[in-house]
Structure formats: C-alpha cells, structure tokens
Amino acid sequence: MGCAIVNGHTILLLVVDRDYRGQGIGEGLLRECEETIRKNGFEKVVLGVGFDYLMPGVPTSRQWAPSVHEHLDPMVNTAASDFFEHRGYVHAWGACNCFDMRMQLEDFCQNDHRIGDMIDGILYRWAVDSDLNEICLCADDACQYQDESFSKYYCNASLYHGDSHQRVLVAEKQGRIVGTLIVSIETEGKDTGNVGCTCVATAEAHQGIATRMVMLGTRYLRDIGLKHANLSYTYSNLNKMYGASGYEISTYYFMGEKVIKLCET
C-alpha cells in the first residue's frame, strides 16, 4: 500500500499506492520517518537530496521563480509537494527552481559542428586517461563557490574508455582543459541519452563553452541513433543554457526541509 525510505536525516522516498491515498497512510509514514530521524539525533528533515538520493526532491509542477523553456510532463502536478507543505515543509532553495529537462532528439537541429572540431580557438574532444588530473582541477575550479564539487563524478576510470556507456567531453584551450561534460548512453533506459555535470573553469565562464559542449554532446547522442535526451537535477538560469540545444523543463522539484525538535532525554 505504501512505503518510505530514510537515510540519516533524509527521506529518500515516501509513496502510497494510488488506490489507497487519502486514508492517512502517507501521513502515518511521514510521522514514522520524522520520529526515526529525531531519534537518530537530527534536528532537520530533508526531502530527496541528503547523504544519498533517488531524486533531488519532491516532483511538482510548481515553480518558485519565473522560468523559460518549459514543457511539463502531463502527469506532474502539485499534489505531492502540497502534501509536504501542508505538514510544515518549506522549499529550501528560496526563489530558485530545481528541475529536470528533456528533449526529443529528432528535434535537435544544431548541425554546424561535431566532437573533434576546433571552434573559436577551443578544441572539443573526448577525454583520455591522462586528462583526469586536469579534469578534476577544472571541475573544482568551476564549483569553488558551490557547496559541492563535481570532480568526484569524474574519477571513474571507465569514463575514459572508448567503449563505455559514459564518456567525458572536454573543451581544451591552448593545451589546458577549461570545460568538462559527461555524456551518457542508455544509462537511464533504452534509446535515451543524458548530458550533465557541466563544468567550465571560472576564468573562461560566460563565453559559450558550456552551451557548445551541451550542443556537441547532444548531437553525438542523436547521431548514434538515440531518440531521447535527459538532464537531471539542474537549477534556475541553467535552463537557458540547456534550452539553446532544445531541452525543456519536464518537472520541477520541491526541495523540502523541516526543522524538528530533538527527543528529550
């Protein structure tokens, strides 16, 4: 009928079968989750992203800031986010949206360049093993003002094998790596590709490098015969960059948090 998964202070999943909703089952599961988190010594409950995650937050059609490039999945609505908001949870990202994007690759029409081309003095190519140190430096530099660095996502050795389902695209300027992107092939289902973990060195930001990497990676996915492309867990303003390739927002996320009182001892 329903289930929930807790890890540390995070509710990774809370779901009730459609036929059993409106009977208090979800509320009971939430109460048990909060009590478990409280007993484990935490003062805050997080929905979605925490020590680990299945999805960034609670899927919703609601947005917290004006947005563009939007084409929501018709199955997405505000029911789940309303459930948590009515029980004291707030969107922790303020006036910033979190969302997934997707596109049909038959609609991709940016055909001017492909991976391997030199564009405006920058070479866009597949990474090799010997690039790893520079890739990590680039990712750390790009994320220096964020809570999390993306360099850890680039450390898997299989990313640098030509036959892997995930590969790293880099932007190289005068022998130095200034941009990185992970391109994934059918890791999220048949006929579906993914681009993400986009990083550009701070000194090279706002020059179109990220937009170009996304276009080239997306063209590659189309050219090898995939039908769909997704990108997950991104946020306000980046939809413009991804939208230049044709991606549209498919679902928003309620990044819910709630402060709870510790158990008295």
Regions found by a protein language model. Name each.
Residues 11, 45-49, 195, 229-233:
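Conserved hydrophobic beta-strand within the GNAT/NAT acetyltransferase core sheet
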Residues 31-119, 254-258:
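Acyl-donor-binding surface of acyltransferase catalytic domains
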Residues 51-55, 187, 237:
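Feature marks short, surface-exposed loop/turn motifs that line or immediately flank catalytic pockets
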Residues 11-22, 49-53, 197-206:
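A short, internal acetyl-CoA/4′-phosphopantetheine-binding micro-motif in the GNAT/acyltransferase core
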Residues 214, 236-238, 260:
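Short glycine/proline-centered loop/turn elements that form peptide/ligand docking sites
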